[in-house]
Structures are given as C-alpha cells and as structure tokens.
Design a protein with these regions (language model features):
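Charged catalytic and DNA/RNA-contacting regions of genome-maintenance
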Residues: 1-357
Length: 357
C-alpha cells in the first residue's frame, strides 16, 4: 500500500502510529477516540467493542473501533490493567481554523507503571516502574535499580547484589520493568505480571544519566543527593528511567522528590517464600482474602493512603543493624513528639484524600 493511495487523515494516522508502535493509539476524531488496523482488532477483542471499517480512499478499507471521549478513561483503565500501553493522541488545533487535516499530537502515554488516574491505582500500594542496570565493574555481580512512583513523586536508587534481585523485586512489586536490550539480567519469578520494556543499551549510559539527574534536580553535582562516584550503575538506571518518563510525557517530566538511596545491608532481604509463609501482607488463603489475617492487617491503624503505603514498605523492608538510627532527639522526646504529630496528622488527614497523588 502506497502513502499516496491513502486519505490525508490516514496518512497522518500512519505517521503518528509509526512513532508509537508499541502502544494502542487513541486517535481523537471529534467526540470519539478511534483505533485502526491491529489496534482496532485488539481493542475489539479485549474491550468487546464493535469492529467496523473505514473508507481509505484508493486503498483497502481499514478495521475501525472507537470509544466516546467521555467514556475513554474507563477503556484506558481496562487496557492498562491487561498490560497494554495506551497513547492518547489529541487534536491540538481548532478544527474550524484548520487548513486541511486537523493537527494532532500524542500528549501522553499511559502504561501499567506510569499512571495517574485513581482508577488505575491502589491507594495502599505504590505503583512502581523500575529500571535495572547491571554494573560493569565487579564481575557484573551488582545491579543498580531506579524505582519511581510517578503518582506520588517517589524516587529510589537501590544498590543491590545480583543474587538479591528476587527479594528486592518482590518487595517493590513493580508494574513495569525497563531493561537494556540483550541484558544478562534474569528477571525473577516474583516480578509477577509486570510489563517488561526493552530499551537501547546506550540509554543506560552513566555519563548521560548523570546529566539527566543534574537537570532533573537542578544541581551541579550529584554528591549533594548522596550519589557517589562508584554509583555508575545507579546513575545509569536513573538516566534510562528519566528518559523513558520524558518520552511518555512530552509536556514535561513529572515532579519527583530527591532520591532515596538504599545501600546493601540497610534493610533485610525477604524472598517471596519468606513473605508468603510469614503472611506479612498477603494471606496464604489466596489473593481473594486481601490482607486479612496478615501482619499488615494486625498493625494497620493508618488513617490515610500515604500512611498505608509507608507501613507496607516498612513491613516488607525491615531495618537491619546496618541502618543508621535517627539522631538529635532522645527516645522519650521522640515518642511524645510522635504522638502529638500523629494526633494532628489524623485530623488533617481526614480532610485530604491523598495529597501526593
């Protein structure tokens, strides 16, 4: 099929789709988002939409499926929950003023690991996307992880032994994982149903990652963020992650907090079997029972989603003797201050649903 045999609209669609081949393209046309070709057939199968066809000039008719703009969030949610990426392509000029085909651009791409809608998020759990970079030094026995929850702005840089990747991934439960194409990193079984996205190897380059981090946090040196010269694998993972997020959000990278850096020995590594047998956050009776009967259910007296997420993190990553205690306040003063703070936080929290999100 030649480009000249297609209608101008379908030529525009093809040009945009070629830049987002790994996503289902929601192509805005008036009050509907239309999907064509393979996207239409996939959406018809997954969402139960009626599959029709559209005239394409001198070329063959193309498969077509559409959803109303007002109902689109629900359809996007269902696709993302099934592990698909969805690129939202909007009309970026007034159709009444357009000369020829209305100009359109992809304004965002929603993936399992990069989502803001409450419909796609569990308030009591983080929604992490993780980039993994194998260290070039030390025989490749160390990996650097950059984990971000764009819905809360949390960013973690984690230095881990390759052999502890399984418990680490079980703790983070990422929805999406970024790897360099051809990477030797073997993903553990605990990654569950995470979407795996392969990226070009150069995107994990440490010098580029250093520039990305400096630009993101507006600093001249990463030392103030706690990043050391030997952290090239952490920096490489962070750079790949930031570049991917920038690609998904052309209008600008989401606001991220200063990175939390985790070093080996700071927290206890709990593998999948240990987590399950101790029933820390999931019952042995199955996922359908939620957290009932678990350690989480016994300890959880949180009043806000933020507190619920933090408690879950603490249970899955208990501090070891290598973690530094908080200094500056005596134990009794800390307890009294904590009680006053929590009392006020409960009152304030009742008026806010989930401020970080």
């Amino acid at each position: 099929m030649t480009a000249t045999s297609q209608t101008p609209l379908m030529q525009q669609y093809r040009e945009i789709k070629n830049r987002h081949q790994n996503a289902i393209l929601f192509f805005r046309m008036g009050e509907f988002y239309e999907m064509f070709y393979d996207d239409a057939e996939t959406a018809s199968r997954v969402l139960g939409l009626t599959l029709t066809s559209r005239n394409n000039g001198g070329a063959a008719d193309v498969p077509l499926a559409g959803v109303p703009v007002k109902a689109a969030p629900d359809y996007v949610r269902r696709l993302v929950q099934q592990g698909f990426r969805v690129a939202i392509c909007e009309q970026v000029e007034d159709p009444r003023l357009a000369k020829g085909v209305v100009r359109r651009e992809v304004i965002e791409t929603v993936t399992p690991g990069v989502a803001w809608s409450d419909d796609l998020l569990d308030g009591a759990r983080n929604n992490f996307i993780v980039a993994i970079c194998l260290a070039s030094a030390g025989g490749g026995e160390q990996v650097g992880l950059a984990a971000a929850d764009v819905s809360t702005g949390e960013l973690r840089l984690i230095d881990s032994a390759l052999g502890e990747l399984d418990p680490l991934m079980a703790r983070l439960s990422p929805r999406e994982i970024l790897l360099a194409a051809g990477s030797r990193v073997a993903l553990p079984a605990s990654r569950h149903a995470a979407l795996v996205t392969e990226r070009d190897g150069w995107e994990f380059d440490a010098p580029l990652g250093r520039e990305d981090l400096q630009r993101q946090f507006n600093v001249l040196s990463l030392a103030g963020l706690g990043v050391e010269d030997s952290d090239s694998h952490l920096v490489g993972a962070a750079g790949a992650l930031l570049r991917y997020l920038r690609e998904l959000q052309p209008s600008g990278l989401p606001q991220l907090t200063r990175p939390i850096i985790e070093r080996p020995g700071g927290v206890m590594a709990l593998d999948e079997m240990t987590r399950r047998n101790l029933e820390l956050v999931e019952s042995l009776r199955g996922a359908g029972n939620g957290s009932e009967g678990t350690l989480l259910s016994v300890l959880d007296r949180t009043h806000t989603p933020m507190g619920a997420r933090l408690l879950r993190q603490w249970i899955l990553a208990p501090l070891t003797g290598g973690a530094r205690p908080t200094r500056g306040l005596g134990p009794s003063l800390r307890r009294r201050r904590s009680r006053r703070t929590m009392s006020g936080a409960r009152c304030r929290g009742s008026r806010h649903s989930d401020p970080p999100r």
